[in-house]
């Protein structure tokens, strides 16, 4: 392992995807995270503005697309291959506008998770793992259909249409 070229170079795209994974229509690399003021100052000195700064949402990164005949929803996976989760679309409040591609986060409000699901559903202890477990299920039962209605998709990047600057999104 220590001498493994792929592991050293961290090339996620060289990994053969699992059967349940699909090639994403757009690459979804991990976003930079800044936790300390010093890191923010370093970032600002390295990159010219303008900037769009947002809070880090703790859920499952997703991509929603309506550029084909049917809408599609994917998880980020390794950024190149993710999971198709189209079966969740009908339970989420997603736009039906044609020809849009939006990146966002599937989350549950923390207060809602604590009041309705903490320790009650599959012994869930935190909201991120709770969301991940639901989203990654191949089939969902009637109880889970109701739970999924409590999940929000929070958009943070409009990929299509392409002419929108981040500050206009």
Model-derived regions: residue spans:
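Flexible glycine-rich surface loops and low-complexity tracts that mediate binding to linear polymers
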Residues: 94-117
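Structural beta-strand/beta-sheet cores of well-ordered domains, especially the beta-sheet scaffolds
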Residues: 27, 49, 58-62, 98-104, ...
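Short acidic, glycine/serine/threonine-rich loops at helix termini
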Residues: 65-67, 114-118, 141-143
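Structured loops at beta-to-helix junctions and adjacent beta-edge loops in soluble globular domains
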Residues: 34, 56, 67, 76, ...
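Short, conserved acidic/polar surface loops in the N-terminal third of protein domains
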Residues: 42, 113-117, 166
């Amino acid at each position: 392992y220590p001498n493994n070229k792929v592991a050293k170079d961290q090339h996620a795209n060289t990994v053969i995807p699992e059967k349940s994974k699909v090639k994403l229509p757009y690459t979804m690399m991990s976003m930079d995270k800044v936790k300390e003021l010093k890191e923010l100052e370093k970032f600002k000195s390295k990159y010219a503005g303008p900037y769009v700064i947002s809070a880090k949402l703790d859920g499952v990164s997703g991509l929603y697309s309506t550029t084909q005949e049917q809408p599609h929803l994917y998880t980020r996976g390794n950024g190149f291959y993710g999971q198709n989760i189209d079966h969740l679309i009908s339970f989420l409040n997603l736009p039906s506008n044609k020809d849009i591609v939006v990146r966002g986060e599937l989350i549950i409000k923390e207060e809602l998770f604590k009041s309705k699901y903490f320790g009650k559903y599959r012994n869930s202890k935190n909201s991120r793992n709770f969301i991940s477990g639901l989203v990654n299920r191949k089939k969902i039962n009637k109880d889970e259909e109701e739970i999924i209605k409590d999940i929000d998709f929070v958009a943070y990047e409009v990929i299509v249409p392409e002419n929108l600057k981040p500050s206009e999104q």
